[in-house]
Each structure stands twice: as structure tokens, then as C-alpha cells.
Amino acid sequence: MSPRKTYILKLYVAGNTPNSMRALKTLRDILENEFRGVYALKVIDVLKNPQLAEADKILATPTLAKILPPPVRRIIGDLSDRERVLIGLDLLYDEISEEMLGSAELDTLADDDIASPDS
């Protein structure tokens, strides 16, 4: 089994607002439950560090960016929907692919889907 990828994420927030705190809490819950220690999260307050927001072309908060592994993906706005966050960052697809690749069901399904010349 190959080692799991490490995900590098940046969460851009605007101050210590309820929306920012909710986004951070939801994101940490998702990361702890789904990625257990194989991630690094940097929280950037765009009010304290506007140059970082400008350099990364952040126009709205909260914005979550997946930096690594490529490609870079961003999700802007409400982060309360777990599935939306995972799909938006291409994380759910990786999770499903790894599960399928490790299962015997994939082999069975692939064999059943191959059409024989007789049919």
C-alpha cells in the first residue's frame, strides 16, 4: 500500500467573526476525521495580513485553498457542507478512488463490464 499524501491547505478568514470561527471549526472536524494527521493547515487573517491575500488573489472570505498535492483548488464561502468541501477540493474523489482500488469489488465489477465477442 502506498503512503498517504500530505495535504497542504490555507484557510483565509476576515477577523475573528462567527462565520470565520464556524469555517475553521468545520474544516478542522473534516480534516481530523478524514485525514488524521496527513495535512498541514495555515489560517491567514486577511485583515492582519492583507499582502498575503493580495499575493494569493483572495477576493472573498472564507476561502479554503488546497495547495498540495496539485492541482491547486479553492472553495469560497460556506464550509459547513462536508461533501461540498471534499468535492470542491478534489479530496472526496481521492478518498473514493483509494477505497475502490483497494477493494476486490473493483476487480469483479471490471470483469463483469467487459463484453465478450460472443455477446
From Swiss-Prot:
The keyword Lipid biosynthesis does not apply. Keywords: Biological rhythms. It comes from the Bacteria. One of its GO terms (biological process) is circadian rhythm. SUPFAM superfamilies: Thioredoxin-like (SSF52833). InterPro entries: Circ_KaiB, KaiB-like, KaiB_domain, Thioredoxin-like_sf. The keyword Ligase does not apply. May undergo a major conformational rearrangment; in the free state forms homooligomers. When bound to KaiC switches to a monomeric thioredoxin-fold (KaiB(fs)). The active oscillator complex is probably KaiC(6):KaiB(6). Has 2 forms, fold switches to a thioredoxin-like fold (KaiB(fs)) when bound to KaiC. Component of the KaiBC clock protein complex, which constitutes the main circadian regulator in cyanobacteria; it may modify the ATPase activity of KaiC. HAMAP family: KaiB. The kiaA gene has been eliminated from Prochlorococcus during genome streamlining. It has been suggested that the central oscillator in Prochlorococcus does not have to be as robust as in other cyanobacteria because the former live in specific niches of the Earth's oceans; they divide exactly once a day and at the same time. Thus gene loss and changes in kaiB function compared to other cyanobacteria, can occur. Belongs to the KaiB family. This is Circadian clock oscillator protein KaiB. It comes from Prochlorococcus marinus (strain MIT 9313). The gene is kaiB.
